[in-house]
């Protein structure tokens, strides 16, 4: 019996550590984040720029804007005809993003995009005032996107949007932010996805303190995934909470030993 209760703090503290945070960013300052679409050619990916806009809107509504515990709201403001990221590497493309926004586009010139299994990537940067991000899908002639269904492409887009607003990868396959979607259709968010979005953009700031690549979506965004030090700290806190819970339960059981002995028989 004591052995069972000793497991409680370990089990309790293990539930919330699947998501990681992009240390280069840590989230936008504002819960309401606009997504602008660059007026770049997406034909290599198998769709028009207009269709790309629709896919992003659908991805936003079907995934991230549907998290009830998160205050994050992503608004697709449409195609900005004055922005074109064709020919740009990420370092140049992100300079075209407005502060506090995500710029989404297609490109066949990013160095790693000659590998068709790399479907896209996202980069975020912050300074003393605010953050901005750029999301680019692979529109190279070799891109595997042209062979994917709309549902799969929306999952790819939603995955990269997750990076763009501050999430890293999850190690568990049932989550959208798992490092490889492997061509499957991810129709919903997993618990790590939900916890990560809630941690970064909670309705109540106090709630955050209680929470404890893809083919391949390759992480070429130079993410330094934060999780080691913070995860250890959160693990210790939650372990102690679990220990207190197990102590309370054990005390209750011992004080009612006769009843529980009859029950266990």
Name every feature range the model reports, one short phrase each.
Residues 16-264:
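Zinc-dependent metalloendopeptidases
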């Amino acid at each position: 019996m004591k052995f069972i209760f000793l497991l409680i703090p370990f089990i309790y503290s293990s539930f919330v550590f699947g998501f990681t945070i992009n240390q280069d960013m840590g989230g936008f300052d504002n819960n309401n984040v606009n997504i602008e679409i660059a007026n770049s050619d997406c034909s290599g990916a198998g769709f028009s720029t207009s269709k790309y806009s629709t896919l992003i809107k659908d991805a936003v509504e079907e995934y991230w804007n549907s998290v009830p515990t998160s205050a994050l709201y992503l608004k697709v403001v449409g195609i900005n005809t004055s922005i074109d990221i064709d020919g740009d590497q990420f370092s140049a493309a992100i300079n075209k993003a407005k502060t506090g926004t995500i710029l989404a586009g297609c490109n066949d010139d990013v160095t790693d995009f000659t590998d068709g299994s790399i479907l896209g990537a996202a980069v975020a940067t912050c300074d003393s005032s605010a953050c901005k991000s750029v999301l680019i899908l692979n529109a190279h002639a070799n891109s595997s996107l042209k062979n994917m269904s709309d549902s799969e492409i929306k999952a790819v887009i939603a995955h990269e949007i997750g990076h763009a607003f501050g999430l890293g990868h999850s190690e568990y396959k049932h989550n959208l932010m798992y490092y490889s979607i492997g061509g499957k259709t991810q129709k919903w968010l997993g618990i790590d996805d939900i916890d990560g979005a809630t941690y970064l953009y909670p309705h109540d700031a106090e709630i955050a303190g209680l929470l404890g690549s893809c083919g391949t979506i390759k992480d070429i965004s130079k993410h330094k995934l934060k999780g080691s030090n913070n995860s250890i700290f959160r693990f210790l806190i939650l372990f102690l909470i679990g220990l207190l819970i197990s102590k309370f339960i054990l005390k209750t059981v011992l004080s009612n030993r006769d009843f529980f002995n009859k029950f266990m028989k």
